């Protein structure tokens, strides 16, 4: 026990160093509303149709530890039977191989993260798994460091289920940069308030619905198969075409919590300063939201609605509810007509390395003390086990 105690202290010190001292310190861009004389409309020219896709679902993997209970090929076949064009089986830290026919549009996806705090992301389009993570940490700077690591290999990166285990806060999404989308609706709930927080802070991120199912079946009424999906607005049936449309926000999300039928989007256009939306049926309500989720306008019982875009609208997004289902449109944003803003958290190199060096010196000192305590013939040091845990003779 006398030799084990110093080694345990050293191990805990090394873990504390990685969790507390290694993550960079950042200067996060302050909140800044979207600005510009032009409106970026990801739906300009859209007249219906698209590729039906899901990127977040779990099969039987890792010996059942992740609670998926359906073999991957069977789950893939279920989505294929429902007419999905793009099927992403996002098992934890495991790329989903192609399971479909030769005509399948294969876009890889996996869920990154193995932390108790569930700070997870769906990584779409990567060619390998990134294993870097902070197993215990949940600070904003640790989350930003993980995003930066994932960004190097992730063509499209989604922040998952923000309130599951309190994995992300409103403040996190207002500060973090480098992610492309936030899950707005899955079996775990709805997070349009987190989405609005990010948009209100000037983060040009899109909203994505998904199943996130772990127990998927065709017959079980409790299955989450098909409750969340995206319709991608592209005629390119290729990986690159899908990823390009995702990055540009050219998709809309469908959330059918009780497996209601989908809502068909027909158009979303800006003409004469009016944002005009039309769907294929009379909607229960069509709502137009501005910053911080402020309800700007709504129309009930009609298949279409318009809203006059104001000078004080940095962005406007639309939700359509019909027969219990919800259609989420990505926002129209003010921009300069050239490129959407790309806020980027800046690493504070001086602070980062000062803390890393100080932490390394502290671990080195503990290593020296532990080595003394473990040296044969040592009479004990500050790191020796307390007398209460030594064996009596």
Describe the predicted segments one by one:
Residues 77-81, 113-115, 130-134, 148-149, ...:
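Glycine-rich loops and low-complexity Gly/Arg-rich segments
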Residues 1-46, 62, 216-393:
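C-terminal functional module detector
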Residues 15-177, 183-201, 208-220, 329:
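A metal-dependent hydrolase metal-coordination microenvironment
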């Amino acid at each position: 026990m006398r030799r084990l105690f110093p080694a345990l202290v050293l191990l805990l010190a090394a873990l504390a160093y990685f969790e507390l001292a290694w993550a960079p310190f950042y200067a996060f861009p302050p909140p800044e509303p979207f600005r510009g004389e032009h409106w970026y409309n990801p739906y300009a020219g859209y007249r219906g149709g698209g590729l039906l896709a899901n990127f977040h679902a779990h099969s039987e993997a890792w010996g059942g530890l992740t609670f998926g209970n359906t073999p991957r090929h069977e789950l893939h076949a279920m989505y294929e039977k429902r007419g999905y064009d793009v099927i992403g089986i996002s098992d934890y830290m495991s790329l989903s191989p192609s399971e479909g026919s030769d005509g399948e549009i294969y876009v890889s996806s996996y869920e990154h993260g193995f932390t108790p705090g569930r700070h997870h992301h769906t990584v779409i389009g990567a060619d390998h798994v990134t294993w870097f993570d902070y197993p215990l940490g949940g600070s904003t700077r640790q989350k930003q460091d993980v995003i930066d690591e994932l960004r190097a290999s992730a063509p499209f990166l989604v922040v998952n289920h923000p309130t599951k285990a309190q994995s992300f806060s409103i403040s996190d999404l207002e500060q973090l940069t480098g992610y492309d989308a936030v899950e707005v609706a899955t079996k775990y709930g709805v997070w349009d308030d987190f989405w609005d927080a990010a948009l209100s802070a000037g983060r040009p991120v899109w909203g994505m619905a998904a199943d996130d199912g772990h127990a998927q079946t065709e017959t079980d009424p409790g299955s989450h198969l098909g409750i969340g999906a995206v319709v991608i607005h592209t005629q390119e049936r290729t990986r690159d075409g899908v990823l390009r449309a995702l990055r540009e926000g050219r998709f809309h999300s469908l959330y059918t919590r009780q497996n209601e039928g989908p809502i068909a989007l027909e158009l979303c256009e800006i003409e004469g300063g009016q944002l005009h939306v039309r769907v294929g049926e009379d909607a229960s309500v069509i709502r137009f939201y501005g910053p911080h989720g402020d309800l700007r306008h709504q129309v009930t019982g009609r298949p279409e609605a318009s809203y006059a875009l104001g000078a004080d609208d940095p962005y406007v997004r639309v939700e359509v509810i019909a027969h219990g289902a919800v259609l989420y449109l990505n926002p129209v944003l003010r921009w300069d007509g050239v490129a959407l803003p790309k806020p980027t958290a800046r690493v504070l190199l001086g602070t980062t390395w000062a803390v890393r060096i100080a932490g390394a010196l502290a671990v080195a000192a503990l290593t020296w003390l532990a080595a003394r305590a473990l040296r044969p013939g040592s009479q004990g040091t500050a790191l020796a086990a307390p007398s209460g845990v030594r064996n009596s003779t």
